[in-house]
Amino acid sequence: VSSSIKYDEQKTEAAISELKCMQQENMTEPSDAHIEEKDDKFVIVPEQEGTALKPEKTSQDIIDALVTGRTPVDLEADGCYKEPKVYQSDETLTKNCELINKLTDVVITYDFDDCTETVDRDMIKNWLTTDENGLYTLDKKQIEAYISELAAKYDTVGTERTFNTYDGREITVSGGNYGWQIDQKAELKELTELIKNGETQVREPVYSHEGLVRKTNDIGYTYIEIDLTAQRMVFYKDGTPTADAQIVSGNPFVPNCATPVGCYTTGEMKSGCTVNGEDYPSAVNYWIPFDGNLGISDAPWRMDFGGQLYEFEGTHGSICAPSDQVQIIFSNVEKNTPVVIYE
């Protein structure tokens, strides 16, 4: 064919567009190599070349062959087929496959005593994002959200609790400082490092505040119960009433002196110390703090307890009781024991 051949451009392009190989239904688009999960691990699925043509390039290649007399027309050699963008040999793809297998090959079980929560492959794979280099990394916000959900489910400080009183009533108590609270910032760091290092383990989360019992009923069976209305305090050890005393609580008619209700926790106990009494510092034999400067103590200067004494001889908010009963409590409780106070 002479290079000076003349052709009708429109008719030629129309004829080319009607070729079988140019029909969309006869084309298979190429697919990129990618990562898939198979049999509990991630693998690279190779790219597929496909049979889809680049319309403009193909048309131009055929026209050029007509004009120049070039035969045969090798569309593949001439680069007319669409190509995958990512091949299985791609360095980033290879690194990502290694990374995702490492990051997800971890099982971390959170132990909450009577229930557990598990972080595993199915969860971690949804926590992955890519960095500025296109490589997989853990998404901090996703892990933060998970830990926040754990805290919402298992934190108990200040929450509303159903409580059975010494006289058989079922009441609701809320507020106070007793219970469990996850240190979300510290736990975010711990969980992230465990996943990155591939450390499978059973663990408790990092707590910023701990109670005595980690079960769903975190009051348990050893606790101090204070009924402000009856002016009575009962101490249970392992479910058995061990001390029972009439008390004098805070004076509710003096500003900031009412004993607060709620579920509190015992702090560092002291013996033979001085505390703020009703009107002046007073020496006590036993001191069991439960809320800042408030606590439970004996009151050697008092002869009477109970009744309505708290209304005109009340404390600044602390609880006073006879020495023999406070001594029993002092000798049997440990730090973080619940103190349930209600009216």
Describe these PLM feature segments.
Residues 1-264, 268-282, 286, 333-335, ...:
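Surface-exposed, secretory/extracytoplasmic low-complexity segments enriched in Ser/Thr/Asn/Gly/Pro
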Residues 287-332, 337-340:
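Active-site scaffold segments
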